[in-house]
């Protein structure tokens, strides 16, 4: 047993620098997975032009004239001059972009012209919010989700409202009316 524990400790000690070797503090990303310096993880600042892709960003991710794509982001996505962000698995933090496209779990705030999300524990604030899962709070001209706790806008639509909808037209499959002006809430 002692030899096994020693072997596991040695393997972990050897593997840990290799795991960190692919992380860089600063990166430039563009088309065809071109990353300078080469790597798949950023722990600092990344600038993405046109369409940059990496597995993970922990820090600030700037997108310029195109889309920044990651699997996981912890920090801030910031779209500059028609920049947007796409997170495939998990976003923790704030996305401030022309469009925010988060396919997995989001914890934080999405602020943009268009938000396309899955599950959001936080706030979606944009002209158009579209979510295939649960949203805690949506504020916008139009908000459409599968399930929501709170929606505020001109048009709000969800299959299941847990809290309240406030707007010109509010539709919820479980609402006290399927569609109702000004306010709607669960039966």
Where are these predicted regions, by residue range?
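Surface-exposed, glycine- and small/polar-enriched segments that build interaction surfaces at terminal
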Residues: 21-187
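N-terminal signal peptide c-region/cleavage motif recognized by signal peptidases
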Residues: 16-18
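Sec-dependent signal peptide recognition
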Residues: 2-9
């Amino acid at each position: 047993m002692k030899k096994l524990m020693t072997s596991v400790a040695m393997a972990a000690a050897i593997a840990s620098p290799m795991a960190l070797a692919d992380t860089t503090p600063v990166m430039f990303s563009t088309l065809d997975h071109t990353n300078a310096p080469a790597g798949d993880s950023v722990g600092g600042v990344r600038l993405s032009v046109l369409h940059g892709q990496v597995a993970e960003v922990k820090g600030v991710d700037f997108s310029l004239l195109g889309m920044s794509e990651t699997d996981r982001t912890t920090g801030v996505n910031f779209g500059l001059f028609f920049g947007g962000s796409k997170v495939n698995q998990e976003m923790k933090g704030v996305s401030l972009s022309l469009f925010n496209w988060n396919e997995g779990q989001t914890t934080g705030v999405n602020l943009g012209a268009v938000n396309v999300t899955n599950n959001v524990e936080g706030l979606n604030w944009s002209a158009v919010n579209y979510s295939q899962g649960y949203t805690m709070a949506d504020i916008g001209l139009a908000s459409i989700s599968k399930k929501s706790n709170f929606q505020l806008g001109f048009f709000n639509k969800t299959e299941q409202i847990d809290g309240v909808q406030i707007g010109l037209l509010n539709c919820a499959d479980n609402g006290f009316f399927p569609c109702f002006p000004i306010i709607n809430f669960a039966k």
